[in-house]
Design a protein with these regions (language model features):
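Sequence/structural signature of beta-propeller domains
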Residues: 29-385
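C-terminal motif of bacterial Sec signal peptides marking the signal peptidase cleavage site
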Residues: 24-27
Length: 385
C-alpha cells in the first residue's frame, strides 16, 4: 500500500498532476531548447591530464546479462551484514550479494505492480534500515525494511512519470530527504522543450511512524531557461553539508554535472566539462568529518570506461581510474565502512549490464594519492544512480 500521505489526498494530487501535464504539453508549442544561456560558474577542465590508472577488480559477481543490472547500493547492517543491493531492470528484481565476496544471497521482488513487486527497477538507495527502489515503469518509489526486505509501501505515484535515479540523506530530525530524477517525455523518444522541463527532479520527505511509512512531497524543480536546464537526466547525488544536489546532464556531446541547492534552485555552478565525452553516469561521494572528500563520477563507455575523481569542496579534478575488466558502467556505490578484504571501504560499479565489480578503496587511494582516514565508524557514503 502507498505510504501514508500528510498533504493532499491522492485524488487531489492526481488532479493537480494532470493539470501539470496539460501545462507541459502546452509548452511543447512554445518552441524548443533555449540556446540563449548565460555563462555559469564553472570549474575549468584540463582534459590533457594523464591517462586513468588501471586497477584490478577485487572481484566480480556472477554474471547474467538477462538481469540487465543498472544500479548498486551498499548496506552495512548492525549485526555484521555487508550487502550489495543491485537493481535488475529486465528480471524486475533487486539482487542481494555479499559485499565482501560477491556471493549471491537472495533476490527481492518480481514482476508486477503489487506490494513487494517491481517493474523496471532502476535507482536504489539503502539508508539506515530502509531500502528505496525507484521503479520506472510503475512510476513510483517502493521502500523495503532492512534486513527483512519486507515492503513498507510506495510513494510518488502522483508526481512521477518516468523516474530513474535517486539520492538521499537523513536530516537533523531523523527524516529522510529523497531526490529523484524524472526523465519524462511528452512525445516518445523526444526530449521536451526547455519550457516543459521544470519538473526534472522531485523531492520527497519520508519517515517511519508507529511502524508505518509516511511521506510528503516537498517540491518539483528544474530550470526552464539558461545553463540550469536539465534535458536528459538519470544520475543524481546529494551533499547536504555543502548545500549541493548534483545532477548529470547526460545529453551529448556536452555531458557534464550541474549543481542545484537543496531547496531546488540552480546554483549557477557546473563541473566536469570535457571529462565526459561519452556519458556522465554513476556518482558516489566520499566524505570526511572535516568537510573534505571526493566525488567519483563515471564516464560510461564500452571502449573506455573511466571513473573521475573531483575534490568535494572545490570540484577540482584530481585524477581518474579504470578497471581491468569493468566497462559500460551505469550506477556505482561506495562504502566507507571497513570490513573483510576492504579495511578502508570499497567502491562498486556495474559491469556491462551483467554484474557488479568491486574495487578496494585503499588501492584506489594509493594509486591517486587520496585519503583513507575517514573509514572507522563512518556510515556508508551517499551513492547515486
Amino acid at each position: 500500500m502507498p505510504g501514508i500521505r500528510t498533504q493532499m489526498t491522492g485524488p487531489a494530487r492526481a488532479a493537480a498532476r494532470a493539470g501539470v501535464l496539460l501545462m507541459l504539453a502546452a509548452a511543447c508549442s512554445n518552441g524548443g531548447h533555449d540556446e540563449d544561456a548565460s555563462a555559469p560558474d564553472s570549474v575549468s577542465a584540463d582534459t590533457t591530464a594523464a591517462e586513468p590508472v588501471v586497477l584490478e577488480e577485487a572481484f566480480l559477481t556472477e554474471r547474467d546479462t538477462l538481469d540487465n543490472v543498472d544500479s548498486p547500493t551498499v548496506w552495512n547492517g548492525p549485526n555484521g551484514e555487508h550487502w550489495i543491493l543491485t537493481s535488475a531492470k529486465t528480471t524486475d528484481v533487486v539482487l542481494v550479494n555479499d559485499a565482501a565476496t560477491g556471493a549471491e544471497i537472495r533476490r527481492l521482488g518480481g514482476t508486477g505492480s503489487g506490494r513487494g513487486q517491481l517493474d523496471r527497477p532502476n535507482g536504489v538507495r539503502a539508508i539506515d534500515d530502509l531500502l528505496f527502489v525507484v521503479e520506472r515503469d510503475n512510476a513510483r518509489i517502493q521502500a523495503f525494511s532492512l534486513p527483512s526486505l519486507e515492503s513498507m509501501g510506495t510513494f510518488g505515484e502522483e508526481e512521477l512519470l518516468r523516474p530513474y535515479g535517486i539520492a538521499a540523506y537523513e536530516d537533523a530530525e531523523g527524516r529522510i530527504e529523497i531526490y529523484v530524477t524524472d526523465n519524462y517525455e511528452l512525445v516518445e523518444d523526444e526530449i521536451p522543450p526547455d519550457s516543459a522541463l521544470g519538473e526534472r527532479v522531485e523531492q520527497f520527505r519520508v519517515w517511519v511512524e508507529d511502524g508505518e511509512l509516511r511521506d510528503e512531497h516537498v517540491r518539483s524543480f528544474g530550470d526552464t531557461t539558461g545553463e540550469g536546464v536539465l534535458r536528459k537526466v538519470e544520475t543524481i547525488g546529494v551533499d547536504p553539508a555543502n548545500d549541493r544536489v548534483v545532477v548529470a546532464e547526460e545529453l551529448g556531446p556536452d555531458s557534464h554535472w550541474k549543481i542545484y541547492r537543496l531547496d531546488g534552485t540552480f546554483s549557477g555552478e557546473v563541473f566536469g566539462r570535457g571529462y565526459f565525452p561519452q556519458e556522465a553516469e554513476g556518482l558516489a561521494l566520499y566524505t570526511c568529518p572535516d568537510g573534505g572528500g571526493y566525488w567519483i563520477a563515471t564516464d560510461q563507455g564500452m571502449g573506455e570506461n573511466t571513473f573521475h575523481v573531483f575534490d568535494r569542496r572545490t570540484l577540482e579534478h584530481l585524477g581518474a581510474f579504470a578497471g581491468v575488466t569493468t566497462r559500460n558502467t551505469d550506477g556505482v556505490a561506495l562504502t566507507q565502512a571497513g570490513f573483510g578484504p576492504f579495511p578502508a571501504g570499497a567502491f562498486y560499479a556495474i559491469h556491462n549490464d551483467g554484474n557488479v565489480a568491486a574495487f578496494s578503496w585503499a588501492e584506489i587511494a594509493a594509486a591517486l594519492g587520496l585519503r583513507t582516514d575517514c573509514t572507522e565508524g563512518a556510515a556508508p557514503a551517499d551513492s547515486a544512480q
